[in-house]
Amino acid sequence: MATAPGPAGIAMGSVGSLLERQDFSPEELRAALAGSRGSRQPDGLLRKGLGQREFLSYLHLPKKDSKSTKNTKRAPRNEPADYATLYYREHSRAGDFSKTSLPERGRFDKCRIRPSVFKPTAGNGKGFLSMQSLASHKGQKLWRSNGSLHTLACHPPLSPGPRASQARAQLLHALSLDEGGPEPEPSLSDSSSGGSFGRSPGTGPSPFSSSLGHLNHLGGSLDRASQGPKEAGPPAVLSCLPEPPPPYEFSCSSAEEMGAVLPETCEELKRGLGDEDGSNPFTQVLEERQRLWLAELKRLYVERLHEVTQKAERSERNLQLQLFMAQQEQRRLRKELRAQQGLAPEPRAPGTLPEADPSARPEEEARWEVCQKTAEISLLKQQLREAQAELAQKLAEIFSLKTQLRGSRAQAQAQDAELVRLREAVRSLQEQAPREEAPGSCETDDCKSRGLLGEAGGSEARDSAEQLRAELLQERLRGQEQALRFEQERRTWQEEKERVLRYQREIQGGYMDMYRRNQALEQELRALREPPTPWSPRLESSKI
């Protein structure tokens, strides 16, 4: 921040730019400022304080005055030219800051010394940056010429007087700036500077309290500057101020007290964190951060899910596009194949319009009929396969029945042979019985006994013969029943066979008819595709 001292004619600045507005009437201000130059703005309004350039010119004044007093003699000035001297000469009550003075109601409510250094500042930081630039650019010059405000405030008074009391009042006003007031504070920057100590509209409190530390490092010791007899300016007078009361006091004066307080503070924090009611601010902060982290995690998850969904949709669209292109390529290849086989129409010239084809509709109908007949043929083939499977099953059943009939016939023949043998045995026994009874006329006990035995044997033979006859009758009935069943199965198989053969003949006949019809349709299509022969008049020979 480049600053230069103003010309000699312009009124010197002072620390009064840091003062807040006092409750004085406009008439008193106009009367006090009538003789001072540069105290009004171009629009005619009174300036509230001095600019930063005038403040810096005030700080540089001792060095410039020391250079200018080499060739000229020092002469006391009867009429004060600076703003602060004129102001406090006319209004001595504003500069009375002695220990016995009490603040009047409504006048010095905002002038009390407050520990403003430790108040939080919420400004835009322009004043802090401007003071940093001031310290960096003009540090060397201010170190040689001026002193720090800390040195000004701590030195005992050397020659108390009206100017010392005025400077003391100005310094106390600078240290007691009210940061929470509703009125805007005076600016410390001119139109060319980039930052200001003033509070811009819409911003927080002024950062002047946090920037006062830089003023303590803006120059060297004011004692060195005030030792020479030719350094007789306002900074020399400021160095003679008495020590002001401290604006604040530390709660812990030593490191031992701080170490003793720390365990109690840690225990309080632990007890506060262990509370279950959630009233602890640390617990609330942790819960708020956890809630924010969960919300951020959910947001990231939703974004990831949305991204994956979009990627899947894009992949699906790409696959659909590839499928559509493949279908188009397949249709094109089919058309090319049909054109190569001679089934496609002849290509026309690119400039000619397509002519109306009267055979297009019959061709489409023929194609539709061919497709329909092909479907019918496939259905008939399926039915034929099913009928052939049923016929094979029936043939297998007939073969098994024939095998069973053959076995039953063999068994019946064996039983018939046994029955014939038994009959012959019975007949022989019957013939032998009367032949034995005729020669034995005398009846003895032996004969009687033998006769009884023969009768008993004949009765047993008769019973067995009757039993055999009954069994033979049953076998004959069973054989007849099996023969009837076999004959019925044979007739059924014959009917099925004739029906299947008739169905096959019908299918073959229908297939042949369809084949002939397809051939005829293909011939018609071929005839329709052939270009018509050009018409030529019939030439008749004139020779007879």
UniProtKB/Swiss-Prot annotation:
Residues 186-222 have a biased composition (Low complexity). Residues 294-530 form a coiled coil. The modification Phosphoserine is found at S176. It is found in: Cytoplasmic vesicle; Cell projection, Axon; Cell projection, Dendrite. Binds NEDD4. Interacts with 14-3-3 proteins. Interacts with MAVS. Keywords: Cell projection, Coiled coil, Cytoplasmic vesicle, Developmental protein, Immunity, Innate immunity, Neurogenesis, Phosphoprotein. Residues 61-84, 116-252, 335-365, 430-465 are annotated as: Disordered. It comes from Homo sapiens (Human). This is NEDD4-binding protein 3. Plays a positive role in the antiviral innate immune signaling pathway. Mechanistically, interacts with MAVS and functions as a positive regulator to promote 'Lys-63'-linked polyubiquitination of MAVS and thus strengthens the interaction between MAVS and TRAF2. Also plays a role in axon and dendrite arborization during cranial nerve development. May also be important for neural crest migration and early development of other anterior structures including eye, brain and cranial cartilage. GO terms for cellular component: axon; cytoplasmic vesicle; dendrite. InterPro entries: N4BP3. Transmembrane segments: none annotated. GO terms for biological process: innate immune response; nervous system development. Belongs to the N4BP3 family. It comes from the Eukaryota. Pfam families: Fez1 (PF06818). The gene is N4BP3.
